[in-house]
Each structure stands twice: as C-alpha cells, then as structure tokens.
Curated annotation (Swiss-Prot):
It comes from Psittacid herpesvirus 1 (isolate Amazon parrot/-/97-0001/1997) (PsHV-1). It comes from the Viruses. A zinc finger (CCCH-type) spans 115-247. InterPro entries: Herpes_UL31 (IPR021152). This is Nuclear egress protein 1. Keywords: Host membrane, Host nucleus, Membrane, Metal-binding, Phosphoprotein, Zinc, Zinc-finger.
Amino acid sequence: MSDVALKRNSSFFRAKARLTLLKRRDGGVISRSLEHRRSSRRRSSVSAPTRRVSGTLAKLGADDRRQFFDAFFRMTAVSPEETVSLLRSMTVPVIQQENISLPYDINAKFAPGDCISLSEMGYTLEMGGCCSLCSYGWSTTTPPELPALELAFMHHLSSVVEFKELVTSLRVCAGNSIVGNGAYENEGLLRMIKHLLEQSTLFYAYYTVKGGVSHDFRVLISEDGGGDGGSPAYAMYFVFKPGSPLHLGAKLIRQLIFNCPGYKWHADVHEGAFLLVVTRDRCSAIPEPRRVKLDPEDVYRRYCDVLVTEEKVHDYSRLYSTFSTYCPPASRREQTAAPATAKQV
C-alpha cells in the first residue's frame, strides 16, 4: 500500500475514533447536531427551488393554478421522455386539497375528477383519484349512466316507485287536499306536474342524486322566475341531514353536470344543513330536451294514489317553512348584479 493511501486510512480512522470519543463524552449531542446540519443542508440544496415554486403556486387562485398546470402539462407532453424524468424528480405533489367557500358554483369551477367534501370542519375540493372516500366508495354509489337513466326515469316516473319522496314534497308544496276521506285531490298539483314535465331535466337530476348519494336527503321544489312560454320555472333543492358531513364523489358530480345540460348546480348551506341546488341557467341557449312523453293526467292520478303518512307530511311542511326565505345562489347573484347595472345606465 502506498504512503498516500496509508495517510488517508490513518486520517480516516483518527477522525472516526475522535467522533466516537465525542459521542461517548457528550451523549451524542455533537453528532446529532452535525447530522442535523448535514441533513438541513441537503434539504435546502435539493428542495429550495421546489419550495419557492410551490409557495408561488399556493398564492394563486384556483383558476390561475388550473391554467398554469394546463399549460405545464401541454408543454411536457411534447417530449414524453423528459416528462417521465421530470415526474421522477418531483418532490412536491401536484395534486392537493383546496379550500372552497359556499355557495359554490359547481358548473363554473368543475374539472373532471373533482370531488367535494363538506363538514363543520371546512369545505374542500380535491381530486377523486386521490380521495380515500371516493376510492373506498364510503359515501357514494356509482350513479347510473345516461341510457340506463332514461329508461329508469320513464319507468319510475310512471310507477312512482323511486319518486315517492318527490311525490310527498310536491303534494305538500301544492297544498292540502280538497276532498276528504283520506283521498288526495288538488288542482294545484296537476298544474305543477304539467309545468315540471316541461322541465324533465329536474326529474333526471332527482334520479341521479338518489342513485349516486348514499346520504339521506329531502327534496324541495320552488318557483324560480319564468320559464319558456311564460310558464313558471322551478328549482330543486336536495337538503341533507343538518349537522352531518356530505361528500359528493367525482363520478356523481360528472353525472350531474353532463346529465343536466342547461342547468346550474350549486353546493350551499342553510340553517345548518348542506344542500345541492339545481336551477335553470337563464344564460344558456340549450333547449329543454323533449325525449320523454308522459300524460300529465296519468302522472297526476298516480301521484294522488300514493299513500303518504302524516309524519312525512309534517316533516316536509316544517322544511318548506324553514326554506321559505331561502334564495338560490343564482338568483342572489342576479339580484346583486341588477343594482350595479342600473347605476351604470
């Protein structure tokens, strides 16, 4: 062995012996501090640029971040090899939770794969692929696809099997029966059914939510301005149990958006209860689909024959009273914009 190699080995062993002695004498305090400084230097040298970038992204809004990542992935898609090497070197995940506020416009801020979690601890938006609730199916079942939905809609709307909750709500909204002996007759219900059949998308919305959410909910109907041809337009509220958390899965949100063209969806909270609100989008040029042809008289007769308990009627009467002052988010926005427009004129 050469003299240089011997010197290096002897220096190494002397340093090692010195370090061992320091460990024994000081209880490893010095060695831990040295190791801490080394690890902190490694972290600062490796991840400082990453921290700067992630900090900048955190300051951006949701729309700006979406545009940034859209341009970023378009650029990296040009070269798959560089994309793979870049992803391997990343230390900060691209996907993360995002806090939102209510009311939340689902249509305007929807991106495929988004899911929404609402609870008393806060409201968050995240990717369904990274969401444990979506992965394990904790809060949602798989909603039906559109072809199956159309067939089920036509069948169940006539047979009232899946629409009993909605029937109860419609009867309470229309008013008390004009006949006695336990039977139900009300011309107001017939008028509501005629107008609602012109908004068949609301029935699609009800069936989609019922098939895609495992949480119990109540459904309310409310007039929301004028519709086509001077007939009243209706909004539908899906009210969930007060104080209970709500998770809207990525698959469900996708179905709500694509099964209901020309309608707007909002997540909101009222009197401690989370709710989904679906209203006609007055700015949309998409006409109401006319795929389903049902006789209003036939549907009315079937709805009148449904047995509704007094307890259920009382629950819905109380709920309608609670929401008598509630204004849908879309209407609130229009009311806020109207004075501003008037001032400009």
